[in-house]
């Protein structure tokens, strides 16, 4: 139960409008939270909670620029393989009398050796183990990371890897308290001890999660210690329509994204906030580094017997040409997002196709011509193709199904629970599947890694089992290129090659949509939809 201290107002040293602030920020997480351990921060719901509790060496700001966090500065040697971080001296773990006394012990560089080694250890079974793939290994298989003293950390890479600093901003790379993890074991998932602006208070799974203000947090703003909020309260209402009604009643402060159940109630066809809600709600939008797409499994041997794999490039290209993405965005998403007429790299990252030169527009005549060249005029003789999706995206996929039927391509919908779809996709068991990729770090390599032959699932994110020697050679060249502009040129060539081979169908580039009450202040946003609450405060209406 929340204590009465949550009703206290902020101290008088705050700006005047903050003095009357309510101190609890409330949001709903329909998808649930499975773990508060950074080792398992693989989805947005876990990431948002973990990000309030933990810090890493570095972090991203709203402009996607890497900033200091627990490291106050860093150096990279000339050959790009040695990263040296100089740690802050004023950071302590959350206080827990079982491990660290009333204030929490200071952090040490050796804590990072433990934290990173734990992610890379196969026994941890972290889905984020791949983030340290480029770190050199010792003869015993451990990461080549040194702590010359308590305030200096050195990380040695196998080869130059320009995206590495961005990778270190991911929650997988957060600092955990070694003695707490050792003592708690698997219970650390629900009893986390970090260094973040909020500390763990209470969690009844599926009902309520409460985080409390960390009174010893190291960051300040305008001479005042962050965060401004006293607590964060997270509910787990599964029904998104019910959660929306709670938001309208003022019982939630924030919603991200929009569900078809209330889309037309809240937004105009042009994607603006309906006039009935402008006095009550604030809508903020920006491009989202999230590419929504359909993927083909190009390796028939992995599929179950009888499944039809679309191994003919001409058929895949025909599907790409066979539906109107702009119409789909306009009518099914109220113009929230932009049509996927470019490559896999979303706009906003260097290397992206901003002019639609390498992707696919709506061209049914070209689609029919390609089908005829493939030996299936008007689709005659072409087997039915099974498209696996989830209920949330069924409207979009039914639109594509209808559009493709007009040129002779028959799709069969296979609706799965999200977890089941993810598992089948990772095991290469789906011939044609809905997917999306949200940037883990601000580098186009993150998207192009989906097509590197070394990343075949289940060991990596190449869910299509796409393989191209030319692509792999370009990938290797990009990783050796220190100049960002020249590296972006290589990325563009790689994206062009992928789109020509068409292992995917780009649907649209998403948009961050945030709905807040008019009393919320200080809630920023960035293109990967991070939730940063350390500067948030509330004012009375």
Predicted features by range, described:
Residues 31-50, 70-71, 97-101, 162-173, ...:
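A structural "hinge/loop" feature
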Residues 150-151, 159-227, 231-233, 241-242, ...:
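Gly/Pro-rich hinge or "lid" segments in bacterial periplasmic/extracellular proteins
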Residues 162, 204-208, 281-292, 318-353, ...:
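Detector for C-terminal structural segments
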Residues 201-212, 235-302:
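Extracellular/periplasmic solute-recognition and catalytic clefts
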Residues 73-125, 154, 243-246, 309-312:
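Aromatic- and charge-enriched surface segment that lines or borders ligand/interaction sites
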Residues 28-79, 117, 124, 193:
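N-terminal lobe/hinge region of extracytoplasmic solute-binding protein
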Residues 111, 118-177, 204:
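Surface-exposed binding/hinge segments that line
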Residues 198, 313, 339-374, 393-395:
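Structural transition elements
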């Amino acid at each position: 139960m929340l204590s009465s201290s949550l009703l206290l107002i902020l101290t008088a040293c705050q700006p005047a409008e903050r003095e009357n602030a309510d101190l609890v920020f409330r949001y709903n997480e329909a998808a649930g939270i499975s773990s508060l351990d950074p080792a398992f921060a693989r989805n947005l719901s876990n990431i948002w909670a973990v990000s309030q509790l933990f810090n890493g060496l570095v972090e991203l700001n709203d402009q996607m620029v890497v900033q200091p966090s627990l490291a106050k500065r860093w150096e990279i040697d000339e050959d790009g393989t040695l990263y040296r971080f100089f740690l802050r001296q004023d950071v302590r773990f959350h206080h827990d009398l079982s491990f660290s006394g009333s204030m929490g012990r200071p952090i040490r560089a050796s804590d990072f050796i433990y934290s990173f080694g734990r992610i890379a250890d196969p026994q941890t079974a972290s889905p984020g183990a791949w983030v340290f793939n480029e770190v050199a290994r010792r003869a015993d298989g451990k990461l080549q990371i040194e702590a010359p003293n308590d305030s200096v950390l050195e990380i040695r890479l196998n080869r130059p890897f320009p995206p590495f600093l961005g990778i270190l901003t991911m929650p997988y790379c957060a600092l955990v308290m070694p003695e707490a993890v050792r003592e708690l074991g698997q219970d650390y998932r629900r009893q986390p001890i970090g260094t973040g602006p909020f500390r763990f208070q209470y969690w009844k799974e599926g009902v309520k999660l409460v985080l409390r203000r960390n009174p010893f947090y190291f960051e300040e703003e305008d001479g005042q210690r962050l965060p401004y909020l006293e607590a964060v309260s997270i509910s787990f209402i599964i029904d998104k329509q019910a959660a929306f009604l709670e938001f309208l009643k003022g019982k939630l402060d924030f919603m991200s994204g929009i569900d078809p159940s209330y889309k037309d109630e809240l937004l105009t066809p042009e994607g603006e906030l309906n006039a009935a809600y402008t006095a009550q709600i604030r809508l903020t939008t920006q491009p989202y580094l999230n590419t929504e797409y359909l993927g083909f499994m190009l390796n028939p041997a992995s599929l179950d017997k009888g499944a039809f794999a679309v191994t003919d490039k001409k058929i895949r290209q025909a599907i790409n040409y066979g539906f109107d993405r702009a119409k789909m965005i306009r009518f099914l998403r109220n113009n929230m997002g932009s049509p996927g007429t470019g490559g896999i790299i979303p706009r906003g990252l260097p290397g992206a196709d901003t002019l639609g030169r390498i992707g696919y527009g709506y061209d049914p005549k070209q689609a029919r011509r390609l089908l005829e060249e493939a030996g299936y005029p008007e689709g005659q003789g072409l087997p039915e193709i099974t498209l696996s999706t989830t209920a949330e995206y069924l409207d979009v996929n039914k639109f594509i199904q209808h559009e493709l039927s007009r040129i002779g391509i028959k799709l069969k919908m296979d609706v799965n629970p999200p977890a089941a779809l993810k598992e089948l996709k990772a095991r290469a068991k789906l011939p044609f599947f809905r997917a999306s990729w949200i940037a883990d770090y601000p580098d186009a390599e993150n998207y192009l890694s989906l097509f590197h032959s070394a990343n075949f699932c289940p060991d990596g994110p190449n869910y299509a089992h796409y393989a191209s020697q030319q692509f792999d050679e370009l990938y290797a060249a990009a990783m050796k290129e220190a100049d960002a502009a020249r590296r972006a040129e290589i990325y563009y060539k790689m994206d062009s090659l992928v789109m020509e081979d068409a292992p995917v169908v780009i649907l649209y580039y998403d948009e961050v949509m945030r709905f807040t009450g008019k009393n919320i202040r200080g809630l920023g946003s960035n293109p990967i939809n991070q939730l940063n609450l350390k500067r948030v405060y509330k004012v009375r209406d």
